[in-house]
A protein has these predicted regions:
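Acidic, glycine-rich A-domain
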Residues: 1-270
């Protein structure tokens, strides 16, 4: 990477404050009461949440209630678009089911602070634009639910903010999530990625070649899949992820997320 100086890591509820000093993000992350788009997304997600069913997860939750830690890592790229609304409603139910079962679980998300490289690209340009700079954007890593805590409204609602979805650097996000799991004391450590496409950050790819992020994510996946202390799998959101992950499934309807997750978790912990 060229620099990590401008990367942001925050709880969902902290995003607005964390980005307040960044002029390009200040307006779209305003918690204004007249933000109709955000309010509409929350309302729609709550309606879907009211009817969401996670009964398919119950057998796995019951069988793995002890000595298991799970991380769900959600791709928050711009291509997720309006699909994030039904996905978020399902994820809230899933988080609650894990908490009720007493299973340690965290839900994380990854995107970028903005588009076109942000402050990292500006710094690179000021430094004379050296060739092959490595990752050239400002990462945004968000914790929506912490281990051993219930999901909170303000953390969850931030997932639905229209200004959140930007670009996706999957490899570094995987390493971040895996590092959280590695320090857990549970015997079974499971990382499940929800992804709707290949890693993309235009600023990075323009300066390093079209396959730069692709090579990195494949290297990271190979490293994690060879780690016997961690079980890794992925669910593709309208996207086939089997070309990346040894254990995976594909989701075409958001309301089937708990079923897909239950099947994948059973495979990973069998």
């Amino acid at each position: 990477m060229f620099t990590s100086e401008f990367d942001v890591e925050a709880l969902g509820s902290e995003i607005a404050d964390a980005l307040e000093l960044i002029p390009s993000k200040r307006r779209i992350f305003s918690r204004s009461v007249d933000d109709k788009s955000w309010s509409s997304r929350i309302e729609t997600a709550m309606q879907a949440y009211a009817s969401a069913q996670v009964s398919a997860l119950q057998p796995w939750l019951t069988a793995n209630a002890e000595d298991t830690a799970v991380v769900l890592l959600v791709d928050l790229s711009g291509s997720m678009g309006t699909r994030i609304v039904p996905i978020a409603s399902e994820l809230r139910r899933i988080c609650e089911a894990f908490s009720e079962a007493g299973i340690s679980m965290a839900m994380l998300g990854f995107t970028t602070v903005g588009w076109r490289g942000g402050q990292s690209r500006q710094k690179w340009f000021s430094a004379g634009s050296p060739s092959r700079p490595g990752r050239l954007c400002d990462l945004l890593h968000v914790t929506f639910k912490q281990f051993d805590q219930q999901i909170r409204d303000d953390d969850w609602q931030s997932m639905l903010h229209p200004g959140l979805l930007c670009e996706n650097v999957d490899g570094e996000a995987l390493l971040w999530a895996a590092a959280m799991l590695e320090v857990r004391s549970e015997a079974k450590k499971v990382l499940v990625v929800l992804s709707d496409g290949a890693p993309v950050d235009d600023s990075t790819l323009i300066e390093n070649g079209a396959r730069f992020l692709e090579r990195h994510i494949r290297s990271v996946i190979a490293e994690l899949e060879s780690n016997r202390a961690l079980r890794l799998g992925a669910i593709g959101i309208g996207f086939a992820v089997d070309g990346y992950y040894a254990n995976s499934s594909q989701l075409t309807e958001p309301d089937a997320l708990s079923e897909k997750l239950a099947t994948l978790l059973a495979t990973l912990t069998d």
